[in-house]
């Protein structure tokens, strides 16, 4: 089993696209990249901990590759926006691909370079690629939010879904 961590704005919106893939064993919402041990949602939202909302994915590489996950990741984000994603603004919503080893780093860097070279966007691809740091699972009510609260999820992700349809369909 392998592990991946991606930050792409509100973690509620990052779970479903990965969870629906064959070979995904689990997707957990949480926090990473900060200086407080085991932060709460309120602490992270205060922008005082340095964490970003992210998802941790455990996957079976015999069924889905890390490169596949990176491609899925791009299609959930606006990779030209470094100060949050869609309606969620600030460092705690910044787009980041976290890597666990040199192979993951190389895959992410090459994928980013390919996206930039494709001309798909007319602005620079600013998503950062950083070494993984401790991941802290978010509170239970944030896990699988899209299933537990479909109406609230739909309202909170409308701008994101419009962008994704316009730019990635």
From Swiss-Prot:
Active site, renumbered: 10
Keyword Hydrolase: no
Entry superkingdom: Bacteria
Coiled coil segments of this chain: none
Molecular functions (GO terms): L-methionine:thioredoxin-disulfide S-oxidoreductase activity; peptide-methionine (S)-S-oxide reductase activity
A biological process term (GO) from this entry: protein modification process
Enzyme class: oxidoreductase
Record's keyword annotation contains Oxidoreductase: yes
EC number: 1.8.4.11
Catalytic activity: L-methionyl-[protein] + [thioredoxin]-disulfide + H2O = L-methionyl-(S)-S-oxide-[protein] + [thioredoxin]-dithiol; [thioredoxin]-disulfide + L-methionine + H2O = L-methionine (S)-S-oxide + [thioredoxin]-dithiol
UniProt keyword annotations, A-Z: Oxidoreductase
Annotated family: Belongs to the MsrA Met sulfoxide reductase family.
Role noted for this protein: Has an important function as a repair enzyme for proteins that have been inactivated by oxidation. Catalyzes the reversible oxidation-reduction of methionine sulfoxide in proteins to methionine.
HAMAP family: MsrA
Protein name: Peptide methionine sulfoxide reductase MsrA
Record organism: Streptococcus mutans serotype c (strain ATCC 700610 / UA159)
